[in-house]
Amino acid sequence: MTDLSHPNPQFSAADAEKLAIEVFGVTATASPLDSERDRNFRLETGTDADWILKIVNASEPQVESEFQTALLHHLSNADAKLAVPQLKPSLSGDVLASAVATGGERHAMRLVGWLPGVPLAEVKRTFELMRNLGRSLGELDHALQGFIHPGAVRELDWDLRHAGRARTRLHFVRDADRRALLERFIVRFENHVAPKLSRLRAQVIHNDANDWNVLVSKGDHEQIAGLIDFGDAVHTVLIAEVAIACAYSILDMEDPIGAAAALAAGFHEKYPLKAEEIDLLFDLIAMRLVTSVTFSASRHDKTDDNPYLAISEAPAWRLLEKMDAMNPRFATAILRKACGFDAIEGAGAVRKWIADNSKTFAPIVRPAPATMTKALVPYGDATHFMTVASAEQRAKEATEWWDNFCAENNVQLGIGPWGEKRTVYTDTAFESRFIEGQRRIHHLGVDLFMPAGTPLYTPLAATVVSVEIEREPLGYGGLVKLEHRPEGCPPFVTLWGHMAHEALGRLKPGQKLKAGDLVGHMGDIHENGGWTPHLHFEMTTDINLTATEILGVGEAAYLDVWADVFPDVAALAGIPPETFHQDGRTRAEIIAKRKEILLPNLSISYSEPIKFVRGDGTWLID
C-alpha cells in the first residue's frame, strides 16, 4: 500500500520533458497536474497526440504499479466501450519504465494517452448525464469481470470495505456537530453495512470515478467521453463502484438521491445489480464522503497547499448534511425502484394479495363504505373555502362548511383519495428532505370524513404495535399503528390517524384484534391535530417504520416509490373504484344511444335510467 505521508516524487516540468524524450521518444512541453500522491505531467506535443507522464510515488509497491499497467492493457484488449488511457511503451519496449529523482529514489513511470473531454466537475449535471455515467461504468466493470492480478488484492484506505477506519480520524474534525454527524454514519456502517460486505460480489473496479476523473464530451455534455486515473483500482465489492461515482457526481444537485438513482439505474442496465447490493448503496455513498472529509481534516496541517485533497470538501459536507436529514429507508426505496426492484421487498405481493382478497375484509365503518352515499372532499382544489380554511388552521369553519354540504347533498361519507395533489400542507414539516425547494403535497393515505366519535374497525386480524398522540398543529393527534400478517401475504402495517384519545387507554402494544374489532373513534378538532373530523387511513409495506416515520404525504417525483412503500389503501378500506373515477358513457349519452338503436316498443323500466359502472360476478353495480 502506498504511504500517503510519503512526499510526492520530486520532479520538475523540465525533468518531465527530458524523461519524455529520453525514455519514450516524445518531444513535448510539460505542465504539472494535481495528484494526491504521485507526480503527473501533461505533455503537449503540438499535435492531437498529447500524453500524461505519471511518475509513481516511491512508496508504492512494484506489484501495484504492475497491476495498474496490466489493468489498462486488459481493457485495451477487451474492447471496452468507455475510453480509458492507452499505454505507450518506452523506447526499450517496456510499458512500465523507471526514473531516478535527484535525491536518489527510484520511481516507476508510465506514459498514457491524453483523453480529450471536459471534467464532469465543470459541467451542469442532469439525470441523463448521471444515467450515462452509470452505463459507462457498468460497461467498464463488465469488461473487468474475471480480471485479477496479485497487485489488485491490497490494503487501501480508500477501499470502502475499510470505511470504518474513518473513526480513527474523527478527532481531527474540530467542529463538534460535524463530528457527531460523521459518528452517526460510522455507527450505521459498523452495525448494518460492514457485517454484510463479505457476502457481496467482489471484483476489480476503478474505485475513484470522482468528478475530476470522469470526462464528458466537449460537444455534448450529457455523453461520457472517458475515465482517467486508475491509481486507486482495487479488488473490492462491486457496488463500491456505483457508490463512489454517486458520492462525487451528485454533489450540490437539487435532488441528489434522484441523481444517484439515475446513475445506479444506468449501471444496472449494463451490469445488473442485486437487491442486497442496492440496499447498502445509500450508506456506502455516505461513507465515501465520510472517508474523504476525515482524510482532509487529518491532513490540513500538512497539505493546505494541495488543492487536490480538499477539492470537494465543502460540497461533501453539504451533501452529508442533506443525507443526515433523510430517512435511509426511503432513500433506499428510491434507489431500489429505479433499478426495477420493489421499493420495499414484498411490496408487489402485498398489493396483489389485497386486490385478490378485497371482498373478504370486514367493514372499516358501519354500514360498509360501499353502501354509503359518497363525495370527494375538496382538498384537491387549492382555492376552495374548505381547503383554505384547513390550511389556515380554521378547522371549525372548514367543518361547518363540510357538514352543511353533506346535509344538503345527502352525503354520508367524505373521501380524500390516495395520490391527490393538495396545497393544504403549509407547515415546514412538509418540506421535502430529498428535493431542494420542493414540498410533499401528494396524499399517501385515504381519508374517510364522518362525524367525530364514529367507530372504526379493523378490516383484518391485527396486532397493536403502538398507540400515541402527536400534538403538533396539523399533525395526526391520536395515532394507532397495527400490524397485519395474513396467511399467504408478507406482513404490512396500517396507520390510523386523527383518532380520539380514548384509544390510548384501551389499546396496548401486543394486543390482538380480530377482523371487525373496534380500533377507536374519529377524533374531534381538539384532539385530532386541528382538522375537520376524519380518519387518515394508510398502510405501509415497511413494517420497520415507526408510526411517526410513516409519511402522510409525499413528493410528486416519487409517487411510484410511495405506491410501493405506502400503497393505495382504498380496497382495504372497502371503497369501490368507481368512487374515484367512472369510465364509459354518461347517463345522458346512454339514453340518447338507446333511443337511436332500440325500437319504441322496448320501454325503459326506470324514469331515470340506471348508470351501471362495473360488473362483480353475477351482479351489476350502479
Whereabouts are the PLM-identified features?
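Polar/charged, compositionally biased leader and regulatory segments
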Residues: G340-D447, Y558-Q582
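A cross-family kinase active-site recognition segment
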Residues: L91, E122-D177, L200-A202
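Active-site activation/catalytic loop segments of kinase-like enzymes and analogous catalytic loops
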Residues: I239-P272, A286-T303
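Zn2+-dependent peptidoglycan hydrolase active-site motif and core
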Residues: T458-A503
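A conserved alpha-helical element in kinase catalytic cores
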Residues: I55-R106, E122-K124, E128-R131
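ATP/Mg2+ or Mg2+-diphosphate-binding catalytic cores
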Residues: L4, H171-F172, S292-A347
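Active-site-adjacent loop/helix segments that line or gate small-molecule/cofactor pockets in enzymes
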Residues: D583-R614
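An alpha-helical support segment within catalytic cores of ATP-dependent transferases
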Residues: Q10-A20, H149, R165-N207, S217-G219
